[in-house]
Amino acid sequence: MITKLLTKVIGSRNDRTLRRLRKIVKEINNFEPTFEALSDDELKAKTVEFRERLDKGESLDQLLPEAFATVREASKRVYGMRHFDVQMIGGMVLNAGQIAEMRTGEGKTLTATLPAYLNALPSKGVHVITVNDYLAKRDAETNRPLFEFLGMTVGVNVANMAPPEKKEAYQADILYGTNNEFGFDYLRDNMAFRAEDRVQRERFFAVVDEVDSILIDEARTPLIISGPAEDSSDLYTRINTLIPSLERQDKEDSEEYRGEGHYTMDEKSKQVHLTENGQEFVEELMVKNGLMEEGDTLYSPTNISLLHHVNAALRAHVLFEKNVDYIVTEEGEVVIVDEHTGRTMPGRRWSEGLHQAVEAKEGVKIQNENQTLASITFQNFFRLYEKLSGMTGTADTEAFEFQSIYGLETVVIPTNKPMVRNDMPDVVYRTEEDKFNAIIEDIKDRVAAGQPSLVGTVSIEKSELLSNALKKSKIKHNVLNAKFHEMEAEIVAQAGMPGAVTIATNMAGRGTDIVLGGSWQAQLEKLDNPTKEQIEKIKADWRIIHDKVLESGGLHIIGTERHESRRIDNQLRGRSGRQGDAGSSRFYLSMEDSLLRIFTSDRMAGLIQSGMDEGEAIESKMLSRSIEKAQRKVEGRNFDIRKQLLEYDDVANDQRKVVYELRDELMSSDDISEMIEHNREDVLASVIDEYIAPQSLEDMWDIAGLQDRLKNDFDLDFDIQGWLDEDDKLYEEALRERILGMAVDSYKQKEEVVGAQVLRNFEKSVMLQTLDGLWKEHLAAMDHLRQGIHLRGYAQKNPKQEYKRESFELFEGLLDVLKTDVVTILSKVRVQQQEEVEKMEAQRQAQAEQAARRAQAQHATAENQLADDEAEAASPQTVVRDERKVGRNEPCPCGSGKKYKQCHGKID
C-alpha cells in the first residue's frame, strides 16, 4: 500500500527515467532547425568532427544530442522518415546499456540506428545482433544507405561466410549478424593457430534485437564446436528396438501394482526414469539380444555406455514427439523445432546421444555422436561485451532476470500513439474439440466482416489440426510454421488483407510487421522498374484497403492455447494494434491444454468440468488467476534452471578465460622461451623432489631412480651418482642447481644445432597443440563430472560446492600436465629443420579448420537435466573407460611406485 502511494506521488522508476530522458530529447530537437539548414556535405562532415572531438577528450554522452540529431536529419534526407521522440528515448536507453521495451510496429530497427552511429564513432565496432540470417541481411541492407551517407561502413555476419569475408566484415563500423555467428566466431578465434587467422576484434558495444529470445529463451543453449566421437550407430539401432516393449507406470497405480510399470514420467519437469522393475526387464532384453552377459547389470562400470544409450532411447520415445519437438525432412534428416519460435533449426543437434536416439526411432540414418572441442553459453558470451543493450516488444515480465543475470535495467518506452487494441478475457472449454469449434465460428464471423485474423498455435501438429478443420469449413487460409517458412515473408505481407486468415506457430521472433491492408512494398517488388504513376496507384489502392480493414476492427488475434511463458502470449497479442491501429485479441482454452492439465489442481479442474455442458464456455476470473499463477510458476522454475546453469558454467567460464588468455599470449608472442624456461625449472624441480625429498638425508635419496627418470622422460643422461662419488660436499641444494644448470645447457646445445628461430617456432607450436589437446580432454572431464555431481546431494554434500572444488582440482591438474608434457616433448624431440615445424603447423591448421566447419549449437535440454534441483549442462557423448579411473594422487598402475599424476597421468 505504501509502495503504491509513493509511486503515485513521485512516479515509478520507469517514469522518472522517462522524465529525465525527455529533457535530453528537447536538447536534440533544438538542434533540428540548425541541422536542416546544413548541406548534405556539411551534414556528412559531422562524423569527422565528432571523431576529432572524441580524440580531444569529449565523451560519447556529451556528443549524444548532436549525434542523434545528425542521424535523424540524415534519415529524413535518405528515407524521408523522421525519428519520433519516443524512438530518441529508446536510442538513449540502448546507449546507456539498458533494455528498451518497445511495442511491435514502433520502429525498433530505426531506433537502433541512433546508438549504433554514436557508438561507432570511436572506431571500435558496433554489433547489431538478431535471431536469424534473413533479419540480419534485411536490417543491414535497410540501414546501409543511412550509415554510408554519414561515412560509416556496414557489414553482415551470417553463416557460411569464408574467413577472409568474415575478417573484412568485422572491420566495418557497424556489423549486423546473428547471435550464433558472433558466438561461434569467438570460439573459432580461440581455436586458431595464428593471430592472422582470427576474425573478431574487441567486443565493445552490442545492440541485441529480440533480446528476450536471445538472452532468455536461448540461454540454456550452449554454443558448442564439436568433433565426431567413435561410431556407435549400430548400438542405437539395436537398443531402439527394445524400448517399445516398455510400459509406463502411472502415478495413480496402487502400491499393489506399482512394481509392474517399467518407467516413470514427470511431464512438469520433462524427466523419465527406469523403475527397478524396468531395469530388470531391460537387462533381460539386453541379455537376449547379446548386448550384455548373463548376470551382468546395467549399472556396472563397464555398462555405463549401455545405460547412456537406454536413457537416450527412452527419452526419444517418451518425451520427444514428431511434428512438435522435431520434424523429419524428405531427405530423412531429424531437424529440431524451436519450442519458442516454431522455427526449424537445421544444423543444430541435441547432445547426450538424444539426437541419435531420435534418428534411430524414426528409422533414418544415424549421424555420429560428437565430442566437445570448445563451448560457451550465450549468457557468458554476451557478458564479454564492454557495453550490452537490447530491444524487444516484451521484456518487462523478465525484467528481474535481465537485472540479476546481465545487470541490464529494463525501461518500458511509451508508444508514439495510444494503444487501442481490445484484449478480451480468456474463454475456457471442457474439451479441445469444443475449443476448436468455437475458434472456427469466431474465424467465420471475422471473415464475414472482412477482418483479418492471426491464429497462434503452440506446435506444428496443432497448426495442421486447425488447418484441416478450416479446410472442412471451406475457409481459405495460410499456414506459417516451421515446415513452410520459405514462404514466410509473402504470407506475412498479405496477413493484413481484408478477411485474411493466417495460422502461425508461435509468431514470436518473426521480425516482420503485419501491416493492415497488406504490404504495398511487396506488391511493388513484383514489378520491374515501376513508374512513379504505378507507385502512386499501388499506394492509393492500399490506403483504401487499409481504411476498410480499420473499419472492420483491425487485426484480430486468436490464441489457441496459453504458452508456459506470459511473454510469448504477449508477443502474439502484440502483433495487433501497431502504431495506434485498431485491433483485438482473445485466447481460447480447454481443460485438455497442456498448461491447464499439468498445472491446474485436480480440485479446480473437477469443479470447472462438473458444471460444464458440452460446447459450453466459461469466463472465470478465478480460472484466469489460476492460469497466470501456473505461468508464473513455470517462469520461476525456468529462471531457476537458467540461473543454476549459469552458476555451473561460471566455473568453466573462469577456466575458459585463463586458457584463452594463455592462447592469446602464445599467439601474440614470437618468443616464448622465457615461459618454457620457467616451466622446465618447475617440472624438473618437482621430479627431483620425488627422488630427493627436500631437507632429507642422503641415505633416503633414490639416485638410480632419478637418473632413469631424467633419461627416459627428458633425454638427460646424467651420471649423478658419479658426481656424488667425486664430490662428497655436493649437498642437496648444490645438486639441484647442477642438474637444472646441465638441463639448460643441454637445451642450448639443441638450439645451436637447429637454430634459435626454428626452435622458437617449434616451442610455440608444441605449447599450442598440447594446450588444445588437454583443454579438449578437460572439457570432456568437466562434462562427466557435471553429469553425476547431483548425486553428491545424497551424501549430504552441496553439489555446486563439490563441482567447484573438483573442477578446480581438474584444472590444476591440466596446468601441471601441460607443463610436464611440453617440457618432455621439447626435451626428447629432435627437430632437424624448419620444414618439419611448418609441416606440423599445416597439419594442425587443417585439423582446426575441419573442427570449425563442424561448429554447431547443441541444445542443452536443461529442463530434462534438472536432477535434485541441480541443472546439468549439455554434454556430448560420454567417453567410458573399461577400468576404474585411477586417482591422480594414487600409485601409478605401471608399478613405478610414483604417483599417477607424476608418471602416466593425464587429464581424463
UniProtKB/Swiss-Prot annotation:
Record's cofactor remark: May bind 1 zinc ion per subunit.
Residues that bind Zn(2+): C892, C894, C903, H904
One Gene Ontology term of the molecular function aspect: ATP binding
Basic residues bias: start-end ranges: 898-908
Enzyme type, top EC level: translocase
UniProt feature, compositional bias: Low complexity: 852-863
CDD domains: DEXDc_SecA, SF2_C_secA
Chain positions recorded as ATP binding sites: Q87, G105, E106, G107, K108, T109, D513
Bilayer topology annotation: Peripheral membrane protein
Pfam families: P-loop_SecA, SEC-C, SecA_DEAD, SecA_PP_bind, SecA_SW
Quaternary state and interactors: Monomer and homodimer. Part of the essential Sec protein translocation apparatus which comprises SecA, SecYEG and auxiliary proteins SecDF-YajC and YidC.
Protein name, per record: Protein translocase subunit SecA
Biological classification of the source: Bacteria, Pseudomonadati, Pseudomonadota, Gammaproteobacteria, Vibrionales
Underlying gene: secA
